[in-house]
C-alpha cells in the first residue's frame, strides 16, 4: 500500500510502549542512497513464501528500486527504467509471476503515470493511460483476479478524482470510478484478497474538509463504502489498508492541527473506527501509513510517524488481543524519520522502510528480529 511524500508529516527521537511479548526488537539496518541527497523509500513488498523483498521510491535522478534476499537484513540497488528526474515510485506488488511498481513522472508541462514491471530479472516500463491533465499512481495490488493500480487524476480546473487502472494481461485500461462531489478526491492505497478488492484514500466535502474514502470492487464495479469520520469535520484520510481473514483494515490520520492516528475496520456490519494510541509524547502529528497481517496469527502491524513538535519519529503499532499498542522503534535522525511501508514474516520477524531527513533525504530501513 502507499502515500505521497507531501502529505506525510515531520520530527525527532525514540518511541515507547506496550510490554514486549516476544524477545525481538526493531533496529536500523544499512540501506543504499545512490544519489546521496534525495533518496526516499515509499513502499515494500514480499515475494510470498520467500525471504525476498522489493522496496521502491525515488532519488534525485528518478526511480529507486531496492531488493533484499534476506528479509531486509541487507539491501541492493536494482537497475530500473526512469523516464526522468521527476519520477517517483509509490506502490509495489510482488508475485511469483512478476513484480509491479507504480508512480508518476512530474514533467515540465504535465504529470503522468508510470508503471514498471520486473520479469525474468529485468525491469521494463509498461505504457499506462493518462486521461487527465495530471495523473498519479500511488498503489498497486496483484491477486488471482488480476492487477490493479490506483491514484488520482486532476483536470485543468484543479479538481481531483480517483484514478483506477486494471491490467488486462496485455495493457493497462482505465476503470470507471464512483462519482464524487467535486474537490480533492484521491486514492493512496489498494488491497486485495482473491476477487475482494478495496481502495483507500480521501474525499473532500462540506466546504473543503477531508474525510476517509474507501471504495469496494464487486461484480458490478467500484462503489463507495461508507466510513465513519472520527475527526467530525476535521481533516481525516486513509493512507492504506489490508485484508486479514474476513476483516478489512484501513489506517491513516485524523484531526486538523493536532492530528491523531486513525484505524478503522470493516466487517459484515460495516466500517467502525477503532481506538489506536498516538505515539508517546507525540502531541503534534500522528499518522499511520501502512498496515499488514502477521502470518500465523490474528495480529496486525502498522507503521508511520509522529511528532511532539519539531522533527518526526518513527511510529510502529501492533494489534494483538483485540487492542492496538505502540512498539518501541528507533529514530535515527531527530530532524525527521518516517516509515512508509512494512512486511511481516512472523511474530518475531518483520521489515519496514521509509526515509530520514538529516540534510536532504536518505533511505531508512528497519528490521524486527
Language-model segments: which ranges?
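Secretory targeting and sorting signals
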Residues: 1-24
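Residue-level hotspots at or immediately adjacent to binding/recognition sites across diverse folds
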Residues: 22-369
Amino acid at each position: 500500500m502507499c502515500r505521497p511524500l507531501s502529505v506525510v508529516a515531520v520530527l525527532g527521537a525514540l518511541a515507547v510502549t506496550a510490554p514486549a511479548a516476544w524477545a525481538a526488537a526493531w533496529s536500523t539496518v544499512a540501506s543504499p542512497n545512490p544519489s546521496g541527497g534525495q533518496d526516499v523509500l515509499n513502499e515494500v513488498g514480499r515475494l510470498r513464501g520467500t525471504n525476498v523483498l522489493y522496496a521502491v521510491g525515488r532519488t534525485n535522478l528518478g526511480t529507486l528500486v531496492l531488493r533484499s534476499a534476506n528479509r531486509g537484513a541487507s539491501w541492493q540497488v536494482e537497475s530500473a527504467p526512469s523516464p526522468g528526474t521527476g519520477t517517483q515510485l509509490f506502490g509495489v506488488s510482488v508475485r511469483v509471476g512478476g513484480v509491479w511498481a507504480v508512480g508518476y513522472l512530474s514533467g515540465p508541462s504535465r504529470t503522468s503515470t508510470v508503471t514498471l514491471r520486473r520479469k525474468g530479472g529485468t525491469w521494463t516500463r509498461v505504457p499506462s493511460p493518462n486521461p487527465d491533465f495530471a495523473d498519479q499512481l500511488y498503489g498497486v495490488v496483484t491477486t488471482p483476479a488480476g492487477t490493479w493500480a490506483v491514484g488520482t487524476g486532476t483536470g485543468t480546473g484543479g479538481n481531483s478524482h480517483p484514478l483506477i487502472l486494471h491490467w488486462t494481461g496485455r495493457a493497462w485500461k482505465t476503470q470507471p470510478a464512483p462519482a464524487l462531489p467535486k474537490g480533492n478526491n484521491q486514492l493512496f492505497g489498494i488491497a486485495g484478497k482473491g476477487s475482494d478488492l478495496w481502495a483507500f484514500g480521501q474525499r473532500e466535502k462540506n466546504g473543503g474538509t477531508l474525510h476517509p474514502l474507501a471504495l469496494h470492487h464487486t461484480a458490478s464495479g467500484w462503489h463507495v463504502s461508507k466510513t465513519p469520520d472520527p475527526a467530525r469535520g476535521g481533516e481525516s484520510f486513509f493512507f492504506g489498508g489490508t485484508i486479514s481473514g474476513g476483516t478489512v483494515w484501513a489506517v491513516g490520520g485524523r484531526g486538523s492541527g493536532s492530528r491523531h492516528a486513525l484505524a478503522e475496520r470493516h466487517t459484515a456490519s460495516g466500517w467502525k473506527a477503532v481506538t489506536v494510541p498516538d505515539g508517546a509524547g507525540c502531541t503534534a502529528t500522528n499518522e499511520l501509513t501502512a498496515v499488514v497481517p502477521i502470518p500465523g496469527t490474528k495480529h496486525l502491524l502498522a507503521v508511520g510517524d509522529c511528532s511532539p513538535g519539531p522533527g518526526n519519529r518513527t511510529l510502529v503499532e501492533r494489534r494483538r488481543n483485540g487492542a492496538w499498542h505502540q512498539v518501541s522503534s528507533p529514530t535515527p535522525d531527530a530532524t525527521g524519520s518516517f516509515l512508509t511501508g512494512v512486511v511481516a514474516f512472523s511474530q518475531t520477524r518483520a521489515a519496514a522502510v521509509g526515509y530520514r531527513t538529516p540534510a536532504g533525504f536518505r533511505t531508512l530501513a528497519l528490521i524486527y528480529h
